[in-house]
Amino acid sequence: MGTSLSKTQLLDSMRNEQAAWEALLDEIGEAHMTQPEVAGGWSIKDIVAHLTGWRRRSVRRFQALLKHEADFSPPWPPELQEDDEINAWIYEANRDRPLAEVLSDSREVFQQLIKTLDAFSEDELQDLRRTLGLEEEQVSGSMFFAHFHQEHEPDMRAWLEKVKQER
């Protein structure tokens, strides 16, 4: 396992990632979060809801692991299996929700993730690498934000720069 992070280091790393995420949202500003066309027709609010939906799945998965349950229920209908259909479901489930609710939900689900991971012992947390099939990857805070960094952050930052130039 080598240089695996301790639980404290992992949770601190995740909190730092969340702080950077919140700073980006603050920079964007709530007034701009419902404007479409940030990425594929989605607004910042839609991206927040999307990331929250998938993070909620992670929380449920970790809660099941904590209880030594083999299976868990995703937050979407179980017949949905493909990412695109899950993403469409998340979008439809959240598109008419108020921005304040979506942002609050995002923060609440992050806190649930922290609380759930904190409930694992150090040894159980280190075993998550094997459980999740991450033999070559260290469980870290950035791992929980990888999808955001790879798939959404570039679009959000490019859109933000465009908005800044128009101000």
Predicted features along the sequence, with ranges:
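Extreme N-terminal tail/first-helix region
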Residues: 1-20
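Acidic/His metal-coordination segments adjacent to aromatic residues that form catalytic metal sites
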Residues: 2-5, 86-102, 132-141
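Hydrophobic alpha-helical core bundles mediating ligand binding, dimerization, or RNAP-core interactions
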Residues: 14, 18-21, 25, 55-58, ...
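Long, hydrophobic N-terminal alpha-helical segment
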Residues: 14-16, 20-46
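Short, contiguous alpha-helical
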Residues: 34-85, 114, 122-167
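Acidic/histidine-rich alpha-helical segments that form the ligand environment
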Residues: 82-125
